[in-house]
Amino acid sequence: MKTPILFVVVVAVLIVTDSAEGFKGKANSFLKPLQRRGLEEECCQETCSYHEIWENCKKLCSDELHKMFVEICQPPTEKVPERD
């Protein structure tokens, strides 16, 4: 009688553990782009004032962020070049 109960408990633990790992993976895959986007936005916003920094940081910006910041951020002396 103990064997079927033990089997059920082991299977239940495996299912719960697998579900938790799946949830953790989904949470991480959802959070990583948000964290990266936050860094990109911060970097791009900083570049509004400094053209040299823009040149270095625009490589980190996603295409959509780059388009948005090209419209918003114009260096004091020259136009921000289009992304390659």
Curated annotation (Swiss-Prot):
Disulphides: C43-C48, C44-C73, C57-C61
Record field: transmembrane: none
Location within or outside the cell: Secreted
Protein's recorded name: Insulin-like peptide 05
Primary localization: secreted
Propeptide cleavage-removed residue intervals: 23-37
Signal peptide: 1-22
Protein's job: Insulin decreases blood glucose concentration. May have evolved to activate insulin receptors (INSR) in vertebrates. Molecular docking studies reveals unique interaction with the human insulin receptor. In vivo, insulin-like peptide injection reduces blood glucose levels in two models of zebrafish diabetes (streptozotocin- and glucose-induced). Also shorter swimming distance of zebrafish larvae, an effect which is not observed with human insulin.
Record family assignment: Belongs to the insulin family.
Matching InterPro entries: Coagulation_fac-like_Gla_dom, Insulin-like_sf, Insulin_CS
Organism: Exaiptasia diaphana
Keywords assigned by UniProt, alphabetized: Carbohydrate metabolism, Disulfide bond, Glucose metabolism, Hormone, Secreted, Signal
